[in-house]
């Protein structure tokens, strides 16, 4: 299977895992070793979080005054990551020509001050071991779509799952609630 980096994984209705039910995952990495992504359409209802580094708390809580904190996934749920536009920011890793990822909280201050940079903050991430994601896709658990920065950064999180399924030309009610092959 070709790399699905910079693609969306869209969960199908039968996927009832609490993290992934009606989720859209942005894949930041996918290779023969496995895959890593961030759920872009679920927020945590929390105003303040505390990290081990107290200086990071200040930057993080300033950011959270104006932005959501998203559930990135069930892996390393005490770790903060963020996606942002503008690949010219140091200490970030490009995912595509338009999107980068970072775990460096100190960057939040400069990102928040820039009117040209859009961002999303996540707690935790989704991860798959070698071959695991491919098996889930073959099993019919995920739909695949090329990513869109407007969906990642501009859409209301409650609408993202429906928008992505509709953009595939799929009526979600037409998808079976059981997995496997037809």
What does each model-found stretch correspond to?
Residues 1-122, 126-182:
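A short aromatic-anchored loop/beta-hairpin motif
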């Amino acid at each position: 299977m070709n790399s699905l980096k910079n693609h969306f994984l869209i969960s199908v209705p039968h996927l009832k895992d609490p993290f992934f039910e009606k989720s859209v995952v942005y894949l930041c990495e996918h290779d023969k070793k496995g895959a890593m992504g961030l759920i872009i359409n679920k927020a945590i209802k929390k105003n303040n979080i505390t990290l081990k580094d107290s200086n990071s708390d200040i930057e993080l809580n300033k950011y959270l005054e104006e932005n959501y904190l998203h559930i990135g996934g069930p892996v390393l749920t005490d770790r903060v990551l963020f996606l942002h536009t503008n690949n010219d920011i140091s200490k970030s890793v490009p995912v595509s020509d338009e999107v980068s990822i970072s775990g460096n909280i100190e960057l939040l201050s400069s990102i928040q001050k820039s009117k040209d940079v859009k961002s999303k903050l996540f707690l935790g991430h989704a991860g798959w071991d070698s071959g695991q994601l491919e098996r889930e896709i073959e099993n019919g658990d995920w739909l695949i779509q090329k990513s869109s920065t407007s969906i990642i950064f501009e859409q209301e999180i409650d609408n993202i799952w429906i928008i992505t399924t509709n953009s595939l030309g799929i009526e979600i009610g037409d998808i079976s609630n059981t997995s496997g092959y037809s």
